[in-house]
């Protein structure tokens, strides 16, 4: 019996999707544009990084070649030295969205059949009846925001008023999301979670995918910063996923990072949410060391997206990629005979792009492990090919979307 490890590099797209024009994202290319900026000297930051993007281990696994399949060109400095060490290709999303749950569910074999509901980019953004109900049921003096906004910017802009009035900051984006930011101490963390549970119920009628608690600390004088106590309240997947099939077969499942939230804590097994990317990867590899045969580990590394993509931070994104690349040898060393590892992404978030939202992109598919023969797999017509492949590798019965590529 075999084991499997899926690592999602949240937002590391490799070039605009065929339907990117429908989303205003034609020409977006998260990885390619980061590599270009770094090659031009525009990805430098004193004390953090400098020079071309250095991802030698990912290039060796075929990342540059996967990107070339999606965008038509190998990103600067990502040409592999020697033959690739793994299976490489790129995948197109079939779900009508560019959000985290849609991408992850499709990776797990469940493309979303209908688009999510979204709030318009107007002021106010939320229906008046939704706001009235939230204020009444949450016993609030009102809300702040009620608009599309990047999370860090709106907390900086409205944090002082929030402390003065006690009104939580409610905002949204191009994603199907209702976000509530509040001060952990002045408003209360548990009160924020309770309010988000109310919002989750109220948002169901609008087909909103996620309600997110965004706690922060600080003061107007010292500045505000978000904490690691974010909580996502997502709609449950509308059908069976790879995780459901693994659970039904009695297999061990370990979910690291945001995976538990993304799948609404259904069939997610042992959940570990240790914090930033480095801690999540360490937790995943520690879990792999004791994972029984037939088990599955699903890891999300969210900092690419939240800390750098949305903030349009090219040097930070590049440094995060380089930090992950440096740990590829550790991942390879942790794989036992019969293990399969897959590195992929769920959408794009081009830090050189306009605005602050995700970008509709293709994603890399890198599969490797002892005994996995290196070869190209070209363009996969759905992210679900990943779930189908992992299911086949684990010997799970599969009636989901997708076609195995191994």
Swiss-Prot record:
Keywords: Cytoplasm, Isomerase, Manganese, Metal-binding
GO molecular function, one term: manganese ion binding
Catalyzed reactions per annotation: 2-deoxy-alpha-D-ribose 1-phosphate = 2-deoxy-D-ribose 5-phosphate; alpha-D-ribose 1-phosphate = D-ribose 5-phosphate
Entry-linked InterPro entries: Alkaline_phosphatase_core_sf (IPR017850), DeoB (IPR010045), Metalloenzyme (IPR006124), Phosphopentomutase_DeoB_cap_sf (IPR024052)
Gene3D superfamilies: Alkaline Phosphatase, subunit A, Phosphopentomutase
GO terms under biological process: 2-deoxyribose 1-phosphate catabolic process; 5-phosphoribose 1-diphosphate biosynthetic process; metabolic compound salvage; nucleotide metabolic process
Residue numbers binding Mn(2+) 2: 305, 310, 358
Protein's pathway: Carbohydrate degradation; 2-deoxy-D-ribose 1-phosphate degradation; D-glyceraldehyde 3-phosphate and acetaldehyde from 2-deoxy-alpha-D-ribose 1-phosphate: step 1/2
Record bears the keyword Metal-binding: yes
Pfam families per record: Metalloenzyme (PF01676)
Localization, UniProt: Cytoplasm
EC number from the UniProt entry: 5.4.2.7
Named cofactor requirement(s): Mn(2+)
Residues involved in Mn(2+) 1 binding: 10, 346-347
Annotated function: Isomerase that catalyzes the conversion of deoxy-ribose 1-phosphate (dRib-1-P) and ribose 1-phosphate (Rib-1-P) to deoxy-ribose 5-phosphate (dRib-5-P) and ribose 5-phosphate (Rib-5-P), respectively.
The protein's name in its UniProt record: Phosphopentomutase
UniProt organism field: Methylobacterium radiotolerans (strain ATCC 27329 / DSM 1819 / JCM 2831 / NBRC 15690 / NCIMB 10815 / 0-1)
Gene: deoB
């Amino acid at each position: 019996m075999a084991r499997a490890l899926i690592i999602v590099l949240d937002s590391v797209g490799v070039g605009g999707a065929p339907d990117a024009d429908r989303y205003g994202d034609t020409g977006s290319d998260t990885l390619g544009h980061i590599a270009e900026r770094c090659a031009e000297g525009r990805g430098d930051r004193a004390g953090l990084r400098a020079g071309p993007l250095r991802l030698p281990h990912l290039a060796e696994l075929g990342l540059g070649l996967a990107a070339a399949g999606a965008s038509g060109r190998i990103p600067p400095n990502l040409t592999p030295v020697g033959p690739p060490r793994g299976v490489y290709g790129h995948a197109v999303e079939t779900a009508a969205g560019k959000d985290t749950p849609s991408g992850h569910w499709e990776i797990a074999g469940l493309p979303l059949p209908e688009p999510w509901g979204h709030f318009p980019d107007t002021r106010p953004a939320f229906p008046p009846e939704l706001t009235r109900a939230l204020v009444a049921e949450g016993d609030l003096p009102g809300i702040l925001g009620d608009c599309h906004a990047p999370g860090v910017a709106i907390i900086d802009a409205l944090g002082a008023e929030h402390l003065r009035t006690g009104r939580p900051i409610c905002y949204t984006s191009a994603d199907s999301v209702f976000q509530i930011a509040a001060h952990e101490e002045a408003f209360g963390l548990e009160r924020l979670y309770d309010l988000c549970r109310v919002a989750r119920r109220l948002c169901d009628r609008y087909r909103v995918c996620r309600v997110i608690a965004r706690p922060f600390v600080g003061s107007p004088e010292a500045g505000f910063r978000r904490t690691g106590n974010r909580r996502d309240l997502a709609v449950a997947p509308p059908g069976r996923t790879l995780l459901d099939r693994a659970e039904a077969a009695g297999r061990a499942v370990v979910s690291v990072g945001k995976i538990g939230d993304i799948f609404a804590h259904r069939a997610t097994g042992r959940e570990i949410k240790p914090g930033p990317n480095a801690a999540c990867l360490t937790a995943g590899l520690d879990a792999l060391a004791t994972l029984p045969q037939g088990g599955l580990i699903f890891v999300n590394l969210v900092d690419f997206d939240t800390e750098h993509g949305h903030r349009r931070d090219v040097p930070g994104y590049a440094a995060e990629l380089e930090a992950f690349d440096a740990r590829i040898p550790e991942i390879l060393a942790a794989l036992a005979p019969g293990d399969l590892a897959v590195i992929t992404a769920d959408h794009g978030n081009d830090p050189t792009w306009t605005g602050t939202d995700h970008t509709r992109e293709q994603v890399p598919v890198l599969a490797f492990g002892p005994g996995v023969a290196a070869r190209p797999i070209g363009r996969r017509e759905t992210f679900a090919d990943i779930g189908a492949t992992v299911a086949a590798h684990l010997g799970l019965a599969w009636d989901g979307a997708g076609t195995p590529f191994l």
